[in-house]
Structures are given as C-alpha cells and as structure tokens.
Amino acid sequence: MLFHRGQLQQPAHLNSRSYPRPMKRLEDVKISTLDLVPVRHDKGPAESLRNSLNLAQHVEKLGYNRFWVAEHHNMDGIASSATAVLLAYLAGGTSTIRVGAGGIMLPNHAPLVVAEQFGTLASLYPDRIDLGLGRAPGSDQMTARALRRERSGSAEDFPDDVTELMEYLGPRTPDQKVIAVPGSGTNVPIWLLGSSLFSAQLAGMRGLPYAFASHFAPRYMHEAIRVYRNHFQPSAVLDKPYVMLGVPLSAADTDEQAEYLATSVYQRILALMRGHSLMQRPPVDSMDGLWLPHEREAVASFLGLAMVGGPEKIRAKLDVLLEQTDADELIFTCDMYKHEDRLRSYEILAQVAHG
C-alpha cells in the first residue's frame, strides 16, 4: 500500500489501466447505496436521520437500485441502531427504490420479532423491502448482553435462526403453530451478509444472494466469492449465484478534492481502531501527525477497496474490480463530512456507471 502526502493510495493492481475488458460492463451492473447514517461531531442524530432520507430520495432519482442501512449499537457516530424503524421512515419518504437492512444482526434478535417487523414493512411497502442478515453482534460484548438480556443467542445459532426466520416469512404450513402476523407469506427477500467464508458457504448452500462486506474487510473478498459460487445450490429464490460487494466511495470532481474529502473517513476508521468517538470530523490537508505508521497501514487495509478519485479514476478502478470479481451488484458507502459532498459523490458515481 502506497501513500502520498499522508493519504491512502490504491494498490497498484487497481491503478493499472492495462487490463482486460471486464466480463460484465459497468453499465450493466446495478449500483446501490449503503448509508451508515453518520453523525457529525457538531450535530446530532436528528440531522443525520433527515440527511439519510434526503440521500435516499437523491439516489432514487439517480437510478440507484437499493438503499440499505445497517444495525450498529453503542456507537456515537452511527444513527441506524433502530434499523426497522428507520426503514419505515425511508420507505415512506421514497417511492421506487428498494430499501432494506444491510443488515440485521440476527444474534441480537428473536427470529419471530424480525419476521414481524419486516413483514410489517413488506405489507406497507410491497416489493420494496430487503432483509440482509449478519451473524456478528454489531457491537461489543457488553452491549450485546444489554441487547439480549436473558436470551442466550449466539453466532453459532445463526444457521438455525435463518431457517426459522425464513419459515416465518414463507407460506404457512399445516403443522405450523407459531406464525408471524404480518410476515407469514410475505416472502421478504433475504440476503446473507458477511466478511468471512462461513457466511459465503452458508449463502451458497441455501441458494441465497450474498453480500460481502468488502467495504471494511476486503482481505477475504476473492476467496469468499469463490466459496459462495462453488457451494451454490439453486433454490426457489435463485437459479444462479448473485454477488453484491460493498465499496467505500469518495468521488469528487478532481482526484485532489476526492483525496482531501476522504481524510474524514480515514479519521473515522482511525478513531474506531483506537476506541475513540466515531463522530465525523472535517477533512484535513494531510493525515501526517494524526496517525502512526502502523495505524496508517491498518487504515489502508481496512479501506483496501476504497474508490477515491475523480470520474476517470473511479471508472478505471471499477472496471478493474468487475474484471477481477464479475460481481452482479455494487453497493457503495460514502461517509463524507458535508452532506452536499456526499450527494455530489453519488451523482458522479451514477454518471460514471450509467452515463
């Protein structure tokens, strides 16, 4: 990983312009948005939630396929903890874009409750709701205990919990004693999410779409895709594998501006690693003096798939990514400090991807 003026640079293989034509053309790949609903250090969650809706409306007009938010707890810089409640707000303020959880951390919840929540959403907003499931707690162990109280759920229960949840959302069977109302028969589309090979294998064996968390854990991306595709079994949901990759985004009109705006993201990841506040900080001219060499390398690893640059650089990197992965869909997260910069970043991406 190379650096310039204290900022992150892409690995050489993503900077190269001499590469084969991708198996999929970027114009044919769906693009989506993952909003972490970031909270600024000088603002509060209320503005973050309003900005999330505004962003959803913005990308809907730009033709994005879906808008997801993720469950996180006990993090002062992320306002999407009440995920199902937030999704109702987002779906009610939009009209065509799919909205969903990317994802619900199933160890934190009883499958029946999740089925009822998302069954309600699907009843209110038919054919627009997605349910992505993760097996991590989305928090520290102390917070996980606070969420579960007397319950003993764990990641080891995840496969069985997924099965139970799918049964609640599917058609009622004659011998079914517990039903989700709303929920039963809604068949809310379920995705499996993950940053490990476990979730990749499970998604393949269940014939479910798979979203890999390459926006923060790119190290195992290629292996996870291979495992998912190799283990895929056709199902009532899918007849062939479907892979969506998470991608960090910092697009601007020039490469220099994009690199400058990305320093807010670098500071946020650095704070996460140090156990400090995750509230957003304004960009800086240089990260020199803010991180130690080993921290710089750790942030670089965390954001190894980040797309930072102007339109031409973003396009070149995305073409390489598709050539390497043959992904079916890309979902982008953009944590810029100013809301208007985030809006512009998604505009540039839409122009680059679909003209």
Go through each PLM region and give its residues.
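Hydrophobic faces of well-ordered beta-strands that scaffold small-molecule active sites
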Residues: I31-D35, F67-V69, V99-A101, I129-L133, ...
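Active-site mouth loops of central-metabolism enzymes
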Residues: D35-R50, I104-P111, N187-G194, F302-G309
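Acidic (Asp/Glu)-rich catalytic clusters
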Residues: K24-L26, L87-S95, A122-R128, G204, ...
